[in-house]
Amino acid sequence: MRSRTSLLEQAALDWHPPGLVAGVDEAGRGPLAGPVVAAAVILDDLQPIAGLADSKVLTAARREKLYDEIRAKALCCSIAEASVEEIDQHNILQATMLAMRRAVLGLRLKPVRVLVDGNRLPPLDVPAEAIVKGDALVASISAASILAKVTRDRWCAQLHQQYPVYGFAGHKGYGTAEHLAALEVHGACPQHRRSFAPVARALQAPVAA
């Protein structure tokens, strides 16, 4: 039986035509607070990175280690975001597409093709393909998912220092019972997404004394 890593590497070869191919993924579509972060990565075939996988199946420590390795070994990478204000103005889908586009445009090298995790594509001036579950199938998308996830988790840790009552360091902005209870008691902070229903309800309700 072939290992998960070898299967991932073979899938990368199957998806990647000759030339520079960028993998793109995002982190932070579902949370109630903070930006949505996207990353684009062009890997170096001469410097393979072992253990790439969908960021969600990796431990935080493993993601941090791979983050450093990706930044060191990739031909180039770019991380971008769409702000809370842009999410509330446009909606989370359009903000995600905006962050992905910014990440691709931020690459130092222009790819000949872009592979995007999911089933939708941002507007780009290069050929692109959406790949469902691409973060588990294509190495460059896996790398992008790790960069985006680590970047956003670090942002949540910083936000926790500003607003510890919400517990951002633990739930990363997702609508856990703890987070919803904190919203009910304390109301929303400036980094909460006003267009998301739980936050909107918290803003309409009187803050508990």
From Swiss-Prot:
Is Acetylation set as a keyword in this record? no
Under catalytic activity, the entry for this protein gives: Endonucleolytic cleavage to 5'-phosphomonoester
User: Pfam families from the xrefs?
Assistant: RNase_HII
Q: Which cofactor does it need?
A: Mn(2+); Mg(2+)
> What is an annotated GO biological process for this record, any one?
mismatch repair
Q: According to the UniProt entry, what is the EC number of this protein? A: 3.1.26.4
* Compartments in which it is found: Cytoplasm
Location (main, coarse): cytoplasm
**Of which family is this protein a member?**
Belongs to the RNase HII family.
This one is known as Ribonuclease HII
Question: Which species is the source of this protein?
Answer: Acidovorax ebreus (strain TPSY)
Point out the gene that encodes the protein: rnhB
